[in-house]
Amino acid sequence: MTVTIENIHAREIFDSRGNPTVEVDVRLTDGTLGRAAVPSGASTGDREAVELRDGGDRLQGKGVSKAVANVNGEIYEALKGQSPFNQAKLDHLMIELDGTKNKSRLGANAILGVSMAISRAAANSEKIPLYRYLGGVDLELPQPFFNVINGGVHADSGIDVQEFLITPVKRESFRDGLEKIANIYHTLKKILADKGLETAVGDEGGFAPKLGSTENAIATLYQAIESAGYVPGEEIAIAIDPASSEFYDDKEKVYRFEGQKLTSKELLTYYENLVEKYPALISIEDGFSEHDWEGFAAQTKAQGQKIQLVGDDIFVTNPEIFKEGIKKGVANAILIKLNQIGTVTEAIEAISLARKAGYKTMISHRSGETVDSYIADFAVAMHAGQIKTGSMARSERVEKYNQFLRIEEELGKDVALASFPG
């Protein structure tokens, strides 16, 4: 019996920030169900695929009933009766149906929900795990990065840098690495509490203490790592995501950072000094604004041989924009966010481009998440090498890490473990 798509049904659910988002069910003719929920970002790149919101008074204008209607209407009509096993064909059908460059007519949140749910339905129909369906037999567990201190738009902490992350560069297994991070997380909480600092968590499960500066935050991480019994840089490394587009002044072409106005050159000097002072700092994401390609390229030239430089807002997981970045020598790694581009197929294309150009890849969650663990399977399937999906708190974050534990258990001790820098 040929299995085809029988029904596609979307609904409005709520994400981890209490905002509406899209969930999609794809039902196949063999009775199989695939379900997927779409995340949403707080700091977004200007050229990201468009998340269709309703506007108006209901739910502060953030309702997604239009996107839901597009799934239940046009998209369902276009895809019903199609085979679920040709992901690229179905994704391109939806792209053509939308007819815009940024998926603004139907909504990237509508299209991505269907794209993810189709692949999950196909995997379920084949009775194999999603990671196996997407990746075949060649699989690898990624290097995880944990956002343990939140700043920027993810928290009201007064720190301009948005994320301070730690990663277990020395680990025997995924579980071993996760246990190390759990130890540091609880140690960090105690250190903050002992200093009389806030231990409430931000959007991504990290703490949001008023530490006053980037250096204070990194120094506190060093203290937590050492107090937990590990060696900074050797066993546990540090990464930051300044999300600098958020503090870049487009008119004056300066960065309003920690009470100063910095030129691109001055900000680069700041990063160089930071890496020299804290050698455990091995990765900087979006150190320069998405509108400051020259600054980003200058950083890549100056620091690209020493540390990882990740492009997020500047590339927005868009293969065409990424090609431009490769030509201009911008960054040496790319962040992959499924909802930035809006289909599974295009995200895979961006990863393929990165591989050919010698760029590292890091899969990422969004600050508005759901308990859907799709990106965990996706990271394993794609040999992505790295993932960041929050801290060791908030179930929508921890669920992704728990999925890696399940995958590691299923694949056994022989499963490949990505290393940094890989």
From Swiss-Prot:
Compartments where located: Cytoplasm; Secreted; Cell surface
Record-listed Mg(2+) binding positions: D241, E285, D312
Cofactor note: Binds a second Mg(2+) ion via substrate during catalysis.
Annotated SUPFAM superfamilies: Enolase C-terminal domain-like, Enolase N-terminal domain-like
Domain of life: Bacteria
InterPro entries (UniProt xref): Enolase (IPR000941), Enolase-like_C_sf (IPR036849), Enolase-like_N (IPR029017), Enolase_C (IPR020810), Enolase_CS (IPR020809), Enolase_N (IPR020811)
Names of the cofactor(s): Mg(2+)
Pathway: Carbohydrate degradation; glycolysis; pyruvate from D-glyceraldehyde 3-phosphate: step 4/5
GO CC entries: cell surface; extracellular region; peptidoglycan-based cell wall; phosphopyruvate hydratase complex
Binding-site residues for (2R)-2-phosphoglycerate, renumbered to this chain: Q162, K337, R366, S367, K388
Enzyme class: lyase
A GO BP annotation: glycolytic process
One Gene Ontology term of the molecular function aspect: magnesium ion binding
Keywords noted in UniProt: Cytoplasm, Glycolysis, Lyase, Magnesium, Metal-binding, Secreted
Entry-linked PROSITE patterns: ENOLASE
The reaction(s) this protein catalyses: (2R)-2-phosphoglycerate = phosphoenolpyruvate + H2O
Catalytic residues of the enzyme: E204, K337
EC id: 4.2.1.11
Function of the molecule: Catalyzes the reversible conversion of 2-phosphoglycerate (2-PG) into phosphoenolpyruvate (PEP). It is essential for the degradation of carbohydrates via glycolysis.
Similarity field: Belongs to the enolase family.
Record-given protein name: Enolase 2
Lineage of the species this protein comes from: Bacteria, Bacillati, Bacillota, Bacilli, Lactobacillales
Encoding gene, per UniProt annotation: eno2
